Amino acid sequence: RLLSGQSDDGSWNQSVKTTIQRLFGLHLTVRNPTQPIDKALGWLMALAFKEYSPIRKDISQRITSRDLENLPFTPGCFGYFLLGATLFLASIFGREDDTRVQEAYARLNQEGIKKKGRWCGWSCNNNVLRAFVVHPRYSESRATELAVHALSRVQDDSGKWPRVVPFYQTVNALAHLDSPTARRQVAKAFRHLLRTQNPDGTWGRSRKEWNTFLVVHALRRKRLL
C-alpha cells in the first residue's frame, strides 16, 4: 500500500510532503532499503540539496502541524523541514556516507556551531536535530552538543520545556543520544511522563496514538521496555 502510486521519478505525485510520509512509513515497516525506496530517496535528495544553497525561509511554504501527521517532524520553515527530513531518511536508509549527505551535514554543523545550536526557532530546530541524532558521526558533533545544551537551559525542574518546544518529539530525539546533558533531560522528561500518563495508557490531549508511539520508542531506546 505504501508503494502504490509511486511516480517514475521516484516521488509520489511530485510532492515533498507525501514522499517524506511514504518513506517514513516504509522505514517503520520495510526497514531495509529497496529499489523503490532508493529511487524515492534519490528524488528527494536531488531536490533538497538543490534547495540548500542557501536555505530559503519562505513564509509562504511554512510547514504546519496538519502536514506532519505521524511524522517525527514539527512545524517550521520549508527549507529546514526538507533538508532535515531528507538527511534523516538518508541516514536511516543507509545513505549516511553519501558525499552529498556528508556535505549537507557539514554545512549544517558549521551553521549550528555559529548559531550556538539554534538553526531556527525551537519547533523548526527539531527538524534539524532529528537528522543529527540518527547519524553515526554527527550525533556526536559540536552542533548537536550545542543544540542539546540549548534545550537543557530551557527545561524546568518538572521535566517540561517551554510550549514552543515540541515535547514528545524532543524526548524522542534526545533518547537517541548518550551525552550526560541529553541523559539528564530525558530522565527529567520521563518523570514528567510518569506523572502525566492518561488513564488509558496514552499521552497527550490530541494525537494520543502518535505521542504514545514517540514515548514508547524513547523508552525502548533507553532500554526501559
Predicted regions located by residue number:
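Preference for long, amphipathic alpha-helical scaffolds in soluble/luminal domains
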Residues: 1-225
